[in-house]
């Protein structure tokens, strides 16, 4: 008997083993049935089955399985299987989710029945598993059933294997599984319950199945179908047509197959090149592809329909997807070929054979299906009750929420839903009320679509059935029971149709501001906004808008700084409309619906177009109150940032703080208090003007100034008021826009233009700052003498009304320059200033409103002010400014000087000089130059106390008159008014699609580059890929649009050759012209300066800004110079490729890539979207040509550090330039949070460029601006030309690059490296010409170039050399286009350039000469000379610096290096000007400054040695090389420079001094200036630590750092954002010299540097000291990354990007070396002063490499045991390192998958948005036809109702476009993150190679990878900053809106 028992036991064990190892569904069932028969078990006894089975099968394998299952079943929620012992459940579908639900219910003790209509598990398709899913399945014993389950780093499994695992577990737990049974429907309980109490049953096929009598309480749909269970309404998420192909190939598990890497996913968003290569090679066009290796080689891809048609896979094209993919319409053979080709290409043809696996039908396992639409149930569960029987109905799996397959969420979310459903069943079984059960389930279901691996709990061990263990921050009551009443169904079952939903998320601001207004409300709103504007009478939505003034008025009413309404000419409808369209597009992202020309050409604009266009304004500004000063400060803080939004208005505060309340306040006491309050608060960045803070001067008051009595004042006020009232009725009067500053009461100059009889006569308006607000924007003029001068000093370019937008000046200023203007100027002035004209105009002012205002104003004003004082102001104002006076004014103030024509660029003084706003066309600027040649310098007249600034202001008045009252001025162009595109006349109308030439209706219309088209027609001309408004390229010459990867095809080679010839000719002419003009310069010839020097020509007035990048030899252009332009290529002919943000109002379309290739017939097509950044310096961006940009710069104010340094330096030149102080004070007060952000870009843009030996500047297109303060007066004429005679280049291989010198406003900091795709294009050999435009920045020269290190004789940054060094990066592409990266929109134009103007001076002035003798003057001059030479290095010199193996040679001093640079400039003749030009005293000062820096220069630097150098590399490469060179100190060269490589202890010595001096600089009295840098560093640190794509487990390896690596922390590496703000008193170092000094030094020369640098990394753990000894002994670079795991700081396993790429903080130089080797002080320093070093990132970039080459034991040890222990220790460390490397690899893969899934989600969302837009377009077209009378039933419907529907459609479209732009921003950030991660991994692999085996190519590759990675890091940084700014702005706007609503007594309900 015992033997039989043993036999039976052995048999059972074998059968159980067969059951566990079964590989099919049938085999599993068969083995299970045999097992139950053998062991006499009853499967229907679900309560005892598992326990009995466990007791009878006790093999060791089975026991391991029982242990796991018991551990799961021990959870308290199951109550030992008794929680739901009375519940019967039916689960429809035996898929993974159905079986997982069954298992949970079985654990709860329920009776569970699963019906599956098939008896085979044949799905080879692979599921991606989340970490918690893997953990959960392992807990169920998955590894016992399938040994390969998630082995290693595998995170996927085939559906078939997963089903088998769960199937077996379910059977063992007592679940009944019935196969070949199909569920049909639920049967209700019969009505006759008396005879038989039958509950809920189901109908099955076959009908006679035993389950037909099974009664159940719970039914769960898990079959993946959408309508298996009735009662669930569904939402449809439709994208564009998506056709998926799955293919399974036989996996023979060969070695070759094992080597093929899986493809976790290739997303089209950031892998476009892969798909384009695939298409070019095979003709297969995919959107994504995934390859998983399981039991088969599984491929899944999304194919494009056109590709399938072209390849013959689909025979015929049908609109209906079902017909399209039906078997009759698919060629199976072509489908197999298609899948095989795609798989071959994706695996790089490495799979030896691709034989298809066979599916359950015996056919090749290839399938094609449609997932265009995805569905989700609105509810997860419902309750039915019939005849007192309740039925709980639930959904899980795909039936509940269909996944988007590329995201890999299906299985994980299905399991979560299974757990939630089981929890619901448990709650219901325990007696919880049904409504509460449903409410809790719905609360959980709302979380399900949002779950990701990141936002669920990470402690998987604690996961139970309780949702609180899985979801953090869980709210089980977010849905209340009363909200789910409709889910408790007691009546007949309802059938719910499918409901189509858009998946577009709705932001709070959108939903709460939902509009339901009708067009008549829109009209009313427009009337309210335009009320009070002259010539604006809005009576309808059509004709009232034709002149364009109404549109401009709406914009002006909300953003007055954007448009100067006074300068608009009512007759110029084209310009007015185009201005409004351009400003709205640029600032608000509102796309134009037509062009200015079309608008003016039609008698009545299209009503629907206007409704659509105006609705966008309504949606944007609705609810925005007219903001008085108090509310503004209340909402935005006392120190309000008035630059909220994209235009950072630093000084144009006048336009933002105007009182707008229309109801005057009479409470004088309150107003006085408000005035005092505001006067106390003031503006932090402006001086108080107490003398006229409450004074207002009117011309008519001046007329009565003799009267001092208050009664007479009142009388005059009344008399004046009566005249005012009549004045406004005259339609010919241009609206007065002179206004005072609310809250400060500063008078401003009148900017309104008037007819000849008009004088600038302000109304009696303000006597206190808190005035009754005027009628909207009809403000009085306020004029003063000294106060006005002070105002001019404070507001740059305020030679005209500060309230007038800065960009509006170019038009008026330049119009004045014509010959006819000069002829009529005296008469104009007389007419404009005639007092009689004033009185006549005063009689035409509007009556009622102004009466109260004037009375109040007069009372307040004349109570407190002296009439004589006012009269003096008025007389002074109008008696000066080159304007002849007559009548009363001439009597009072004699005008002794003849009128002088104003300068083309009027500004009161260099500090306030602001260049005129530039248009994007260059041709108007040429006209300006020509006019300026004929204008003599303005005579600066003085009358009384008024300085020359008033003269410029008075000139503005004449300009305004000429502009506004001359019908059309030919001397100017509308392009100068605003950066807009004058579209070619050949364009089609707005109703014709640019591509298909068919009718395009309003709702479906998109516009770009002045073209209008259908959304579906907007495709790339090369690949026909769908384009988006936020990412495209456009060729103006060819009129074609391109996608990003194909924009390089924009120009043909013939055009390149033509332009090359033109540019060559131009360069020759320029060189000749410069040689001729050079002798005219009054500059010492011995100075060595390059093109970057700045100076003022003899004939140039001091108030004209001088471009810092103009050649010194360029004098003021004259007509002869202008003639030379005719022979040189016109700027409009230069091809400029622009990648710019499309409608990037709030950075929405940040990814816009528009490549404009300008031509002669489209001369103004740069249509800048970046304008109006900073009002005072907006002009600095208007006229600038497009620059090569990678990601534009996002932070507005960044160059103030140098200004602040100048202010604090006792030897600063600023003290000799009193006029510059106001601007400098403003700069000091408006400190940038990212002080030196742009210096990095100035380094970066030169990274991949050719030498500067092939450039020649074009003739300047306008007079040079005034020089910067730091410019030297002793600059040589011999180096004025940008062309270097001694250098030649191969023009055929590298075309010349010519720069346009006409724009003095361009900041060099704006130039950034080309995007990645640009470099790719360059790598492919695409050579095109790029006439790069010079960045001209007074800021750069006046402020930043002052940043010289006291111990250096050369500039610190290589970019400060010359104008020709400005844009090297884009030149590498070879096309005559400038590239602007799309990331940051218009903020790439630095909005702070005006600050530099404050430091401008006239070098020709004797004061400049005297300044040069002062301390600092010669030094600055010297530094300038050196800096201007230093990067004109020969190729040999540059290569020498970049040669990684060149560490053997001694380092030169900065002087010698500069001498060599000078030699290169001269073409080979060495002239040591550096040392010879400095006096002995200056040298001594420099020497003392060197000592003050204490060790900045190492001894090795001071050993001069001449040497030959190889060809050049870019400065960025130079920096990167130096960094890497410092890492490779164990190389041959490193050994030569390391006399004591065997040193076992960290040397001590000299760096003490350096550390101290650097820290002293950081902690000096100017240390507070570094706080913005620290802030930025922390911000970057936070970002990188959060968004790092790097490995999460490698941080410990960052601790074993070589001394030289850490020492290189002091490098001014390009990505270190805050580098230039580090030493406030330091001078800019020459980069080659700096690298020679800092990078190439050895640890023996800087004894303590290693420890201090390691400590400076900010490692928070003291354990780093324990492995310093090991660090110093390691020779191989690999050793430095081999720090064992236990040696790293505990828990420091996340090498975030903070360590990898964090920019050096604002005190990075101070952080370089700290005297303490303990690290505590250094950590404190790092924590307080910003992030860790960027250079240290290289440590983390490198993967820990293999074995440590040297034993770390003491070399003095001679014991064999010790050696053995050492070897053992090494082996252990190697093992640990291998383990760590494996973890890092897994982490990197997880990060990659995370990015992939995000990308797939974004891609899907974009498709859904596109589809939703298409649907809206269809509806809108139908509606539009009806409204236009084109439909048959047009006259039968109410127009008001139709317009209301139309309005709703328009609003919906606006939301969709906004959401689309947000998605594109996310996509761009994801692309950068992915690219960075790939580069990092690539660099890790490169650095694993032993140093001895590396050749030049290897080192070069490492260097290039490092450079590219640094560039990507910068781009991400800029993008994050941009997004942060946008978020801040949105939050502020929301808060402002909420405050407004709450102030109205309303309540906000967020939805």
From Swiss-Prot:
Short motif Nuclear localization signal, span: 660-681
Compositional bias of kind Basic and acidic residues: 1061-1070, 1350-1359, 1532-1545, 1678-1688
Keywords recorded for this protein, A-Z: Actin-binding, Cytoplasm, FAD, Flavoprotein, LIM domain, Metal-binding, Monooxygenase, NADP, Nucleus, Oxidoreductase, Phosphoprotein, Zinc
Residues of the Calponin-homology (CH) domain: 516-619
Catalyzed chemical reaction(s): L-methionyl-[F-actin] + NADPH + O2 + H(+) = L-methionyl-(R)-S-oxide-[F-actin] + NADP(+) + H2O
Assembly mode: Interacts with PLXNA4. Interacts with RAB1B. Interacts with MAPK1/ERK2. Interacts with RAB1B, RAB35, RAB8A, RAB10, RAB13 and RAB15 (in their GTP-bound forms); binding to RAB1B and RAB35 is of low affinity compared to other Rab proteins; binding to RAB1B and RAB35 is of low affinity compared to other Rab proteins; at least in case of RAB8A may bind 2 molecules of RAB8A simultaneously through a high and a low affinity binding site, respectively.
Record comment regarding domains: The C-terminal RAB-binding domain (RBD)(1796-1945), also described as bivalent Mical/EHBP Rab binding (bMERB) domain, mediates binding to predominantly Rab8, Rab10, Rab10, Rab13 and Rab15 (in their GTP-bound forms).
The protein's name in its UniProt record: [F-actin]-monooxygenase MICAL2
């Amino acid at each position: 008997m015992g033997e039989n028992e043993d036999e039976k036991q052995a048999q059972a064990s074998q059968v159980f083993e067969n059951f566990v190892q079964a590989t099919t569904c049938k085999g599993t069932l068969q083995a299970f049935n045999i097992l139950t028969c053998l062991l006499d078990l009853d499967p229907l006894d679900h309560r005892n089955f598992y326990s009995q089975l466990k007791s009878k099968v006790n093999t060791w394998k089975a026991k391991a399985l029982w242990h796991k299952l018991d551990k799961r079943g021990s959870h308290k929620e199951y109550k030992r299987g008794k929680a739901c012992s009375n519940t019967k459940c039916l689960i429809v579908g035996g898929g993974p989710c159905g079986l997982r639900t069954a298992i949970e219910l079985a654990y709860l003790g329920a009776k569970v029945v699963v019906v599956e209509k098939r008896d085979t598990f044949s799905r080879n398709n692979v599921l991606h598993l989340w970490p918690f899913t893997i953990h959960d399945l392992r807990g169920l014993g998955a590894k016992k059933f399938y040994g390969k389950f998630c082995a290693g780093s595998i995170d996927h499994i085939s559906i078939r294997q997963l089903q088998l695992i769960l199937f077996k577990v379910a059977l063992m737990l007592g679940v009944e599984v019935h196969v070949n049974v199909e569920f049909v429907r639920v049967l209700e309980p019969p009505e006759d319950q008396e005879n038989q109490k039958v509950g809920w049953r189901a109908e099955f096929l076959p009908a006679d199945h035993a389950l037909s009598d099974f009664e159940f309480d719970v039914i769960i749909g898990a079959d993946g179908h959408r309508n298996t269970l009735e009662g669930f309404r569904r939402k449809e998420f439709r994208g564009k047509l998506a056709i998926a192909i799955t293919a399974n190939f036989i996996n023979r598990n060969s070695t070759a197959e094992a080597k093929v890497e899986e493809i976790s996913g290739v997303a089209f968003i950031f892998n476009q090149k892969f798909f384009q290569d695939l298409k070019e090679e095979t003709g297969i066009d995919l959107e994504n592809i995934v390859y998983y290796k399981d039991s088969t080689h599984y491929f899944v891809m999304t194919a494009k329909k056109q590709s399938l048609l072209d390849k013959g896979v689909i025979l015929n094209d049908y609109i209906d997807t079902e017909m399209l993919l039906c078997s009759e319409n698919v060629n199976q053979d072509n489908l197999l070929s298609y899948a095989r080709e795609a798989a071959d290409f994706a695996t790089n043809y490495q799979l030896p054979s691709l034989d298809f696996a066979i599916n359950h039908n015996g056919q090749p396992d290839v399938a094609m299906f449609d997932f265009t639409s995805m569905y989700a149930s609105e509810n997860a569960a419902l309750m039915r009750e019939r005849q007192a029987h309740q039925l709980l109905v639930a959904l899980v799996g795909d039936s509940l929420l269909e996944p988007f397959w590329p995201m890999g969420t299906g299985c994980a979310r299905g399991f979560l839903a299974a757990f939630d459903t089981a929890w619901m069943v448990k709650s219901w079984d325990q007696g919880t009320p049904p409504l509460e059960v449903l409410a809790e389930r719905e609360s959980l279901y709302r979380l399900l679509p949002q779950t990701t691996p990141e936002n669920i709990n990470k402690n998987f061990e604690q996961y139970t059935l309780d949702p609180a263990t899985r979801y953090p921050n869980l709210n089980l009551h977010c849905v209340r029971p009363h909200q789910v009443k409709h889910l408790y169904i007691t009546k007949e079952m309802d059938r719910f149709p499918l409901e189509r939903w858009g998946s577009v998320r709705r932001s709070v601001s959108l939903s709460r501001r939902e509009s339901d207004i009708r067009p008549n409300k829109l009209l009313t709103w427009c009337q309210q906004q335009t009320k009070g504007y002259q010539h604006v009478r809005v009576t309808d939505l059509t004709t009232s808008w034709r002149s364009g003034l109404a549109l401009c008025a709406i914009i002006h009413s909300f953003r007055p700084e954007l448009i100067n309404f006074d300068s608009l000419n009512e007759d110029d409808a084209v310009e007015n409309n185009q201005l409004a369209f351009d400003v709205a597009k640029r600032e608000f992202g509102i796309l134009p619906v037509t062009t200015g020309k079309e608008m003016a050409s039609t008698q009545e604009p299209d009503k629907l177009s206007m409704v659509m266009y105006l609705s966008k304004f309504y949606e944007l500004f609705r609810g925005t109150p007219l903001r008085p000063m108090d509310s503004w400060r209340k909402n935005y803080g006392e120190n309000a940032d008035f630059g909220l939004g994209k235009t950072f208005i630093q000084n144009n505060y006048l336009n933002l703080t105007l009182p707008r309340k229309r109801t005057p306040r009479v409470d004088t006491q309150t107003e006085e208090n408000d005035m005092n309050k505001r006067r106390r608060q003031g503006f932090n960045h402006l001086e108080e003007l107490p003398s006229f803070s409450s004074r207002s001067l009117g011309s008519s008051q001046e007329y009565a100034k003799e009267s001092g009595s208050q009664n007479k004042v009142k009388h005059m006020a009344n008399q004046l008021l009566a005249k005012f009232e009549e004045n406004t009725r005259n339609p010919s009067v241009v609206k007065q826009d002179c206004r005072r500053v609310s809250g400060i009461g500063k008078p401003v100059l009148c900017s309104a233009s008037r007819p000849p009889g008009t004088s600038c006569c302000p109304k009696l308006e303000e006597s206190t700052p808190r005035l009754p607000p005027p009628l909207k924007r009809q403000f009085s003029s306020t004029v003063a003498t000294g106060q006005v001068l002070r105002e001019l000093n404070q507001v740059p370019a305020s030679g005209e009304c500060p309230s007038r937008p800065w960009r509006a000046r170019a038009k008026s200023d330049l119009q004045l320059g014509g010959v006819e203007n000069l002829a009529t100027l005296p008469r104009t002035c007389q007419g404009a200033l005639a007092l009689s004209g004033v009185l006549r105009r005063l009689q035409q002012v509007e009556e009622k409103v102004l009466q109260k205002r004037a009375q109040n104003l007069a009372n307040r004003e004349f109570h407190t002010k002296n009439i004589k004082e006012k009269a003096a102001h008025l007389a002074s104002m109008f008696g000066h400014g080159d304007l002849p006076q007559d009548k009363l004014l001439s009597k009072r103030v004699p005008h002794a000087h003849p009128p002088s024509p104003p300068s083309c660029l009027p500004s009161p003084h260099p500090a306030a000089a602001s260049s005129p706003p530039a248009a994007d066309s260059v041709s108007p600027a040429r006209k300006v130059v020509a006019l300026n040649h004929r204008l003599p310098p303005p005579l600066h007249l003085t009358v009384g106390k008024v300085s020359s600034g008033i003269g410029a202001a008075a000139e503005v008045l004449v300009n305004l008159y000429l502009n506004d009252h001359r019908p059309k001025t030919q001397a100017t162009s509308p392009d100068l008014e605003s950066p807009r595109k004058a579209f070619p006349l050949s364009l089609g109308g707005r109703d014709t699609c640019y591509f298909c030439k068919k009718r395009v209706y309003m709702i479906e219309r998109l516009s770009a580059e002045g073209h209008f088209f259908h959304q579906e027609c907007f495709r790339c001309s090369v690949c026909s890929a769908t384009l988006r408004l936020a990412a495209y390229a456009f060729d103006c010459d060819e009129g074609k649009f391109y996608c990003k990867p194909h924009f390089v095809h924009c120009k043909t080679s013939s055009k390149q050759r033509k332009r090359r010839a033109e540019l060559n000719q131009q360069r020759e002419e320029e060189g000749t012209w410069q040689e001729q003009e050079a002798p005219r310069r009054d500059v010492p010839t011995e100075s060595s300066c390059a093109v970057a020097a700045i100076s003022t020509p003899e004939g140039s007035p001091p108030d004209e800004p001088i471009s810092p990048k103009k050649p010194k030899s360029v004098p003021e252009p004259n007509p002869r110079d202008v003639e030379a332009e005719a022979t040189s290529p016109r700027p409009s002919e230069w091809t400029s490729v622009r990648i710019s943000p499309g409608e990037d109002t709030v950075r929405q379309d940040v990814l816009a890539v528009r490549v404009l290739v300008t031509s002669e017939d489209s001369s103004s097509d740069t249509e800048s979207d970046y304008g109006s950044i900073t009002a005072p310096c907006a002009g600095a961006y208007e006229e600038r040509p497009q620059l090569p940009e990678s990601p534009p710069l996002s932070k507005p104010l960044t160059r103030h550090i140098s200004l602040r340094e100048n202010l604090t330096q006792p030897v600063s030149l600023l003290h000799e330039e009193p006029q510059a102080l106001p601007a400098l004070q403003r700069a000091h007060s408006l400190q940038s949070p990212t002080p030196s952000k742009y210096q990095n870009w100035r380094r970066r843009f030169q990274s991949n460029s050719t030498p500067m030996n092939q450039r020649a500047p074009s003739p300047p297109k306008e007079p040079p601006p005034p020089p910067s303060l730091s410019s030297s007066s002793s600059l040589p004429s011999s180096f004025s030309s940008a062309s270097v005679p001694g250098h030649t280049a191969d023009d055929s291989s590298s075309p010349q690059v010519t720069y346009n010198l006409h724009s003095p406003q361009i900041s060099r900091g704006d130039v950034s490296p080309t995007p990645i795709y640009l470099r790719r294009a360059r790598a492919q050999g695409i050579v095109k010409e790029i006439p790069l435009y010079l960045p001209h920045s007074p800021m750069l020269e006046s402020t930043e170039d002052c940043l010289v290190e006291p111990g250096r004789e050369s500039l610190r940054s290589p970019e400060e050399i010359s104008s020709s060094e400005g844009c090297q990066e884009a030149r590498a592409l070879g096309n005559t286009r400038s590239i602007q990266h799309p990331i940051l929109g218009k903020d790439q134009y630095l909005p702070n350039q005006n600050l530099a103007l404050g430091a401008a001076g006239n070098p020709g002035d004797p004061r400049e000469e005297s300044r040069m003798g002062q301390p600092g003057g010669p030094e600055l001059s010297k530094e300038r000379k050196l800096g201007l030479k230093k990067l004109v290095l020969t190729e040999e010199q540059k290569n020498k610096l970049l040669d990684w193996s060149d560490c053997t040679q001694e380092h030169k001093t900065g002087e010698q290096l500069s001498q060599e640079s000078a030699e290169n400039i001269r073409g080979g003749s060495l002239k040591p000007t550096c040392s010879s030009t400095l006096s002995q005293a200056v040298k001594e000062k420099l020497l003392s400054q060197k000592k003050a820096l204490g060790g900045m220069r190492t001894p090795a630097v001071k050993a001069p040695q001449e040497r030959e150098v190889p060809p050049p590399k870019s400065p960025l490469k130079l920096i990167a090389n130096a960094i890497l060179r410092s890492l490779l100190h164990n190389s041959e060269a490193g050994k030569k420079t390391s006399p004591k490589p065997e040193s076992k202890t960290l040397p001590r010595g000299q760096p003490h001094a350096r550390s101290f001096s650097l820290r002293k600089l950081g902690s000096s009295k100017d240390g507070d200036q570094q706080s913005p840098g620290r802030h930025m560093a922390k911000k970057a640190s936070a970002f990188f630590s959060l968004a790092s794509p790097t490995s999460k487990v490698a941080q410990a390896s960052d601790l074993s750092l070589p001394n030289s690596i850490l020492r290189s922390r002091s490098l001014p590496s390009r990505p270190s954002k805050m580098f230039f703000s580090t030493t406030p008193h330091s001078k800019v170092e020459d980069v080659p010299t700096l690298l020679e000094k800092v990078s190439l030094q050895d640890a023996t020369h800087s004894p303590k540097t290693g420890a201090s640098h390691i400590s400076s990394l900010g490692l928070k753990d003291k354990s780093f000291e324990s492995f310093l000894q090991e660090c110093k002994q390691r020779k191989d670079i690999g050793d430095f990354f081999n720090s064992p795991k236990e040696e790293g700081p505990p828990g420091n396993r996340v090498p975030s990007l903070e360590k990898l790429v964090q920019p050096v903080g604002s005190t990075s130089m101070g952080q370089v070396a700290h005297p303490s080797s303990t690290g505590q002080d250094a950590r404190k320093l790092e924590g307080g002063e910003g992030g860790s070093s960027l250079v240290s990132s290289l440590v983390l970039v490198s993967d820990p490499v293999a074995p440590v080459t040297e034993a770390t034991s003491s070399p003095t040890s001679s014991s064999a045991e010790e050696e053995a222990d050492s070897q053992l220790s090494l082996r252990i460390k190697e093992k640990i390192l291998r383990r760590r490397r494996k973890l890092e690899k897994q982490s990197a893969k997880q990060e990659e998958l995370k990015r992939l899934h995000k990308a797939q989600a974004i891609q899907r969302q974009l498709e859904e948005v596109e589809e939703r837009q298409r649907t809206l377009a269809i509806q809108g077209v139908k509606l539009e036809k009806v409204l236009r009378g084109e439909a048959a039933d047009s006259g039968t419907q109410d127009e008001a109702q139709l317009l209301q529907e139309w309005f709703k459609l328009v609003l919906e479209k606006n939301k969709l476009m906004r959401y689309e732009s947000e998605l594109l921003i996310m996509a761009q950030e994801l692309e950068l993150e992915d690219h960075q991660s790939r580069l990092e991994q690539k660099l890790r692999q490169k650095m694993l190679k032993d140093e001895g085996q590396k050749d030049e190519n290897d080192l070069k590759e490492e260097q290039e990878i490092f450079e590219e990675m640094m560039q990507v890091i910068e781009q991400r940084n800029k993008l994050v900053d941009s997004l942060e700014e946008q978020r801040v702005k949105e939050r502020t706007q929301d808060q402002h809106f909420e405050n407004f609503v709450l102030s109205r007594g309303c309540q906000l309900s967020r939805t």
